[in-house]
Amino acid sequence: IIYALKHTIGRSDLTKSVWSDLAASLAMDIKGTDMHSWDDFLKYCDGATVAPASIYIYLLAATHTKEKHFEYEMPHELSYYARDLAIYCYIVHIIRDLIKDAIASPRLITIPNELLFENDLSRSTLSSSLKNKDPAIVNLANDLIRRADPFHRHGHEVLSELNNLLGFSEKTALNKLIGVYDQLYRLAQENVQILIEGGQGLEEKFRT
């Protein structure tokens, strides 16, 4: 991806908005901006996950012109293809890395306060709650998985569209990536505790 970006930035029609959104989410991280509501979370996702996903889809879809520029000619704008898949994967990612992030720093927890408070949890106590196997952690994770469902469904509808538009190698790479998250998601639907406790190892297993 880094190699591809090096040879496309400045010679492509990739919109500036993805970089602006990415910068905005990074600024929130640096400032330690509190995330109160689910709407705050979705706004943060615009930069934290939708923007990188949009760049990835651009790299998969862009065509190289005779003038040695890259052009995006898909039927819809990038965010149409990226948004639902990105948010769905990001929610799974949050649960997968919950223990690691909670131990490292409360600032790494990008779960809105309203979800934490509804389950009698907080960022500052999340690490100890995980260590003590507080049942509220499972309730929180199940809540997140339920909220991921519409993004999963809509995202896979869009993925079907992408499979009819991308080249063989490009759609193979995309489906392999999404497939890893699909396996983690299905596992979480059956028993989210397994994903919480073994997320990193499970991802490595599913990637092989």
Functional labels for PLM-detected ranges:
Residues 1-88, 100-208:
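Catalytic cores of Mg2+-dependent Asp-rich isoprenoid enzymes
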